[in-house]
Amino acid sequence: MMLHSALGLCLLLVTVSSNLAIAIKKEKRPPQTLSRGWGDDITWVQTYEEGLFYAQKSKKPLMVIHHLEDCQYSQALKKVFAQNEEIQEMAQNKFIMLNLMHETTDKNLSPDGQYVPRIMFVDPSLTVRADIAGRYSNRLYTYEPRDLPLLIENMKKALRLIQSEL
């Protein structure tokens, strides 16, 4: 009798937990296709030209993330970028955001070569800020997961430079 009750209770718990898991999954928004996993709550522009237009119009800096789906370094950076609340909040509210899986015709976005991941900032006057760099001398604009504090600092620097130049 007790075994029968315990079995019934287990079955009930499994049913409730699986229904709860289904309900939680349904609550999640479908991924925004333009985010490509970098942050579904961020409004992403589709093209570099669109990004430049909105940067100039809104007086916000444009942050351009070059990456590839099959690059382990891009994937590792994307994972921590998407999970970092401070980065997501700044990206969502203070930047025009673009992530690209192909190169643009603007050679200013690849001052030291075409590699991924690469993050560049463009100010509202449409100047590529080559002075905002990462920590690696051989790939100035790349960031690794452990470099998030530097990326956050560089995002803040991009915002400060705009304030001081307006």
From Swiss-Prot:
Keyword Transcription regulation: no
Tissue: Expressed in the lung, in the ciliated cells of the airway epithelium. Expression increased with differentiation of airway epithelial cells. Not detected in the mucous cells. Expressed in ciliated cells in the oviduct. Also detected in stomach, colon, prostate and liver. Expressed in breast, ovary, prostate and liver cancer. Expression is associated with the level of differentiation of breast cancer (at protein level).
Protein name, per record: Anterior gradient protein 3
InterPro entries reported in the protein's UniProt record: AGR/TXD, Thioredoxin-like_sf
Keyword entries, A-Z: Endoplasmic reticulum, Signal
Signal sequence extent: 1-21
Location within or outside the cell: Endoplasmic reticulum
Subunit architecture: Interacts with LYPD3 and DAG1 (alphaDAG1).
Chain span(s) of sequence motif Prevents secretion from ER: 163-166
GO molecular function: dystroglycan binding
Family listed: Belongs to the AGR family.
Location, primary (coarse class): endoplasmic reticulum
PANTHER family: ANTERIOR GRADIENT PROTEIN 3, ANTERIOR GRADIENT PROTEIN-RELATED
Induction remarks: Not induced as part of the cellular response to endoplasmic reticulum stress. Up-regulated by androgens and by estrogens in prostate cancer cells Up-regulated by a hormone (estrogen-receptor alpha) independent mechanism in ovarian cancer.
Record SUPFAM superfamilies: Thioredoxin-like
Any one Gene Ontology cellular component term annotated for this protein: endoplasmic reticulum
Record's function text: Required for calcium-mediated regulation of ciliary beat frequency and mucociliary clearance in the airway. Might be involved in the regulation of intracellular calcium in tracheal epithelial cells.
